[in-house]
Design a protein with these regions (language model features):
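Intrinsic low-complexity, intrinsically disordered or marginally ordered coil/linker segments
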Residues: 1-75
């Protein structure tokens, strides 16, 4: 499991097969507002992601997801 910090939000990248309910159980004191599936390619110089996430009660939005991922900060 990897934890990646983004400005004021935290992202947890789980292994394949994890569900949104698993994320909520792992972090009971935090509000989990989005769960999704992305493929990360991380090297020492850059982070790339492919895929889309689904915010709760909204539609998938690839453009917003890419905006989010471009602002990743290594924790």
């Amino acid at each position: 499991m990897k934890y990646i910090r983004f400005e004021l939000a935290g992202f947890v990248v789980f292994e394949e097969g994890q569900k949104h309910s698993d994320i909520v159980k792992k972090f009971p004191n935090d509000k989990v507002i989005s769960a999704g599936f992305v493929n990360l390619m991380i090297d020492k110089d850059q982070v790339q992601c492919h895929g889309e996430s689904q915010s709760l009660n909204s539609r998938p939005d690839k453009e917003d997801d890419m905006w989010l991922w471009r602002r990743l900060i290594y924790a």
